[in-house]
């Protein structure tokens, strides 16, 4: 192939869309970390009316989500490196079938692993949402 798939056309558009989604995920993760820090501070207060059980559960779920996000982030960075290696390999010698297949195989492995990690992140976010709703309901009962 003689086209620059990385920087023009449909593949480029997909890469841009993925990068925008990743940036959105990073912003959301930053908000979750801020919320987690606030909940930890609230939980450390000596207040008998605080819903301690719900607070602890939500904090634990947020901590797990943060750890799994770090793993997702590591796989994402490896995927982008493998993607760049693939594009570089194709650009260097489009006739190097073995080199291209190796680079594509590596890219596919990271893509598959990232997909699995995305499923874990999604499940964690569902748990965070459920726990936050329980905490919210318990906080409303404090009034």
Residue map of PLM features:
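Short, charge-rich amphipathic alpha-helices with coiled-coil/heptad character
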Residues: 1-11, 45-62
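C-terminal amphipathic alpha-helix
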Residues: 1-41, 65-143
